[in-house]
């Protein structure tokens, strides 16, 4: 995944944020916090993971499905953009 090397620091920042969120869930469970608080923390984790997934899928489509040397106005590029939008909305 050569494209991830270029965005590596941005992706690692996301992963570290997710790690912090998961650790917050663990602390909440250990401290026997209210169910609604734990559920909200888990929902935040899920949202963060979905955001990471969307970022990785978009990079994969742009660099492995699309031919980077091909004109940006091609029907393939338009279809790829449409797929990216659909995946992003699904993962929200």
Region spans (language model):
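Solvent-exposed interaction patches of small proteins and small membrane subunits
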Residues: 1-92
């Amino acid at each position: 995944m050569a494209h991830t090397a270029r965005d590596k620091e941005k992706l690692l920042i996301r992963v570290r944020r997710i790690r912090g969120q998961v650790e917050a869930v663990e602390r909440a469970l250990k401290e026997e916090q209210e169910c609604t608080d734990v559920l909200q923390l888990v929902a935040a984790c899920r949202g963060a993971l979905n955001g990471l997934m969307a970022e990785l899928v978009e990079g994969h489509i742009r660099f492995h499905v699309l031919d980077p040397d091909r004109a940006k106005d091609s029907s393939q590029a338009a279809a790829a953009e449409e797929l990216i939008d659909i995946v992003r909305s699904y993962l929200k």
